[in-house]
Amino acid sequence: VAPFPHGKLVTYKYIADVKAGVDPSLV
């Protein structure tokens, strides 16, 4: 589970960013 409380839409974006090779800490 992603460690932030922004909800499922952001969680899916987080997963997509990780798959794209984007560091989620920069998003």
Curated annotation (Swiss-Prot):
It is found in: Secreted, Extracellular space. Its main location: secreted. GO terms for cellular component: extracellular region. It comes from the Eukaryota. The keyword Transcription does not apply. Keywords: Lipoprotein, Secreted. The keyword Ubl conjugation does not apply. Hemolymph. Homodimer. Unknown (it might play a role in lipid transport and/or storage protein metabolism during metamorphosis). This is Larval-specific very high density lipoprotein. It comes from Apis mellifera (Honeybee).
